[in-house]
C-alpha cells in the first residue's frame, strides 16, 4: 500500500466512524422524542376520555375542557420536571414559563397542556444538546488529530526522501495519531457560526418550533371537530417532522465540524491548499457533483452553502475537504463502487464525479441506473 492509498483508507475509515457515531446519537435522540411524544399522547387521551365522544369534540366541549381549572398539585409536578433539566439556560426557560403561569388568578387545563408541551420540548432539547455536544467534541479531537498526523507523516516522508542518510519516519503498519488540541480551540470550532448560526442555536430553534406547534394543538380552534385518533396522528406528525430536522442537523453539523477541525489543523501547520472530494454514488447532489476535485487555497476556505468553497454546501452534504500536497496527492488509483452490481472497479485517484458516472453509463443502461436510483431512495428511511 503506497502512502496516498494509506491516507485515503484512513480518511474513508474516519468518515465511516463519524457516520456510526452519528447513528448512535440519532438513536439516543429518537428515544427522547419518543418518550416526549408518548407523554403528551397520554395526556391527550385523558383529555378526550373526559367527553367520551366518537364524533369529535364540539366547540362547546373543547372550550369546556380547556377552560376547566388545573389541580394545584399539577403545577408542583411540572416544576419538578423543569428542575430536572440539566442545561442551565433550558432549565431557566422552563422555570420562567411556570413562574408566569403561577401568577395567574386561575390556571386552566389549556394552560397546563401548553406548559406540558413546552417543558417536553425543553427536555428533548436538553438531551439533544448534551448528546450532540459530546459527539461533536469527539469529532473535533479525532479529526484534528488525524489531519495533524497526516501533515506530520507526509513531511517526515519528504524529509526521508531528501535526506543524505537513512531515516525511518513512517511505518504504515502503525496507527499514528497526534490528538492534542487545546480546549479553547475545541470551543472555538464548536461555537463557530456558519450561515448565521451554530449547532446549539439550531437545536434551540428546532425545539422552539416544536414547542410552538404543540401549544397550538391544545387550543379550542385546533380541538374542535377532532377525534382522539385524529389528534394523536397529528401529534405524531409534529414529532416526526421535528425529528427529521434533528437528523439532518446531526449529520450536516458533523460534516461541518469534521471539516472545520481539519481546516484548523491545516492553518496551524501551514498547509496551503485543499481539494474537495464528493461521494461517487447516485445520491450525490448536483452542487457537489460540480465541486468534486476542485482545489482551493486554505486562505480562501469559506463555508457559505452552495456559494461557498468549503463544505458543507447544503443539508445532508457528504462532501469533504482533503489536504492537497501537489499533483502527487492524486497519484495512483482508487476502488470505485458500481451501484448497480455492488462490485468495485479501478479509477484514477483524480477522477471526478463525471468521470465516475461516465464509466457507470458505459457499464449499464439508463433504465438500469434509474431503477437502481429508485431502489436506493426507497430504502432510505428519511429522504
Regions found by a protein language model. Name each.
Residues 1-226, 230, 328-383:
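N-terminal leader/targeting and assembly helices and adjacent pre-domain segments
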Residues 230-236:
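Short, well-structured alpha-helical segments that form the helix of a local strand-helix-strand
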Amino acid at each position: 500500500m503506497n502512502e496516498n492509498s494509506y491516507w485515503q483508507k484512513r480518511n474513508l475509515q474516519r468518515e465511516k466512524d463519524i457516520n456510526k457515531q452519528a447513528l448512535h446519537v440519532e438513536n439516543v435522540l429518537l428515544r427522547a422524542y419518543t418518550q416526549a411524544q408518548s407523554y403528551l399522547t397520554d395526556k391527550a387521551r385523558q383529555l378526550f376520555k373526559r367527553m367520551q365522544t366518537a364524533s369529535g369534540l364540539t366547540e362547546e366541549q373543547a372550550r369546556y375542557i380547556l377552560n376547566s381549572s388545573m389541580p394545584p398539585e399539577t403545577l408542583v409536578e411540572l416544576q419538578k420536571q423543569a428542575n430536572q433539566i440539566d442545561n442551565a439556560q433550558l432549565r431557566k426557560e422552563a422555570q420562567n414559563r411556570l413562574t408566569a403561569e403561577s401568577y395567574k388568578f386561575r390556571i386552566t387545563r389549556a394552560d397546563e397542556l401548553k406548559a406540558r408541551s413546552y417543558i417536553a420540548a425543553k427536555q428533548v432539547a436538553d438531551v439533544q444538546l448534551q448528546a450532540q455536544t459530546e459527539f461533536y467534541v469527539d469529532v473535533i479531537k479525532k479529526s484534528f488529530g488525524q489531519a495533524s498526523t497526516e501533515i506530520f507523516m507526509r513531511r517526515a516522508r519528504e524529509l526521508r526522501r531528501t535526506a543524505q542518510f537513512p531515516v525511518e519516519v513512517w511505518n504504515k503498519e502503525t496507527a499514528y495519531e497526534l490528538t492534542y488540541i487545546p480546549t479553547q480551540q475545541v470551543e472555538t470550532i464548536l461555537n463557530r457560526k456558519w450561515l448565521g448560526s451554530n449547532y446549539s442555536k439550531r437545536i434551540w430553534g428546532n425545539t422552539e418550533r416544536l414547542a410552538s406547534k404543540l401549544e397550538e394543538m391544545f387550543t379550542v380552534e385546533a380541538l374542535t371537530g377532532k377525534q382522539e385518533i385524529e389528534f394523536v396522528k397529528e401529534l405524531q406528525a409534529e414529532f416526526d417532522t421535528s425529528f427529521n430536522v434533528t437528523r439532518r442537523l446531526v449529520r450536516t453539523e458533523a460534516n461541518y465540524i469534521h471539516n472545520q477541525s481539519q481546516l484548523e489543523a491545516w492553518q496551524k501547520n501551514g498547509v496551503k491548499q485543499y481539494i474537495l472530494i464528493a461521494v461517487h454514488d447516485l445520491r450525490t447532489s448536483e452542487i457537489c457533483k460540480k465541486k468534486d476535485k476542485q482545489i482551493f487555497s486554505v486562505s480562501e476556505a469559506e463555508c457559505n452553502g452552495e456559494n461557498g468553497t468549503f463544505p458543507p454546501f447544503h443539508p445532508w452534504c457528504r462532501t469533504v475537504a482533503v489536504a492537497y500536497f501537489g499533483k502527487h496527492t492524486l497519484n495512483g488509483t482508487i476502488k470505485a463502487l458500481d451501484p448497480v452490481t455492488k462490485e468495485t472497479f479501478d479509477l484514477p485517484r483524480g477522477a471526478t464525479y463525471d468521470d465516475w458516472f461516465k464509466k457507470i453509463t458505459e457499464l449499464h443502461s439508463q433504465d438500469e441506473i434509474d431503477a437502481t436510483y429508485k431502489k436506493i431512495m426507497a430504502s432510505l428511511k428519511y429522504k
